[in-house]
Regions:
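N-terminal Rossmann-like NAD(P)+-binding domain of SDR-like oxidoreductases, especially those catalyzing
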Residues: 1-129
Length: 129
């Protein structure tokens, strides 16, 4: 089985997805800028699965860091993308922040995937009122 990148993997949904992927036999790598989490989920994943998962603290919108990550970790077979802001009230107050993080960074991710011939993307989003 191939290597899967989970963005936002230190969050609730991302960390649970990583556990499932490991249990299915995938090698998983994670990136999370820790803006909405503290990274403690990584220890929980290891406790549950017995597998040490590497989290690299970078933003999906940082093109240079993302390119470096793909180069060092590749080949990556697929990306499951959870790295997005989700608070509706905050998005109304700070729309540019949400645009940059949720849309512009997604475009950086897609361009990087294209450069490294990673053609499989699962995009998921949740919301918090």
């Amino acid at each position: 089985m191939g290597k899967i990148l989970v963005t936002g993997g230190c969050g609730y949904i991302g960390s649970h997805t990583i556990v499932e992927l490991i249990q299915l036999g995938y090698e998983v790598v994670c990136i999370d800028d820790l803006s909405n989490s503290d990274g403690s989920a990584i220890a929980g994943i290891e406790s549950i699965t017995g597998v040490k998962v590497k989290n690299t603290k970078i933003s999906v919108g940082d093109s240079v860091a993302l390119q470096t990550f793909f180069k060092e970790e590749g080949p990556i077979e697929a990306v499951i993308h959870f790295a997005a802001f989700k608070a509706v009230n905050e998005s109304v107050t700070f729309p540019l922040k949400y645009y940059q993080n949720n849309l512009a960074s997604l475009l950086v991710l897609i361009e990087t995937m294209k450069s490294y011939h990673c053609n499989n993307l699962i995009f998921s989003s949740s919301v918090n009122n």
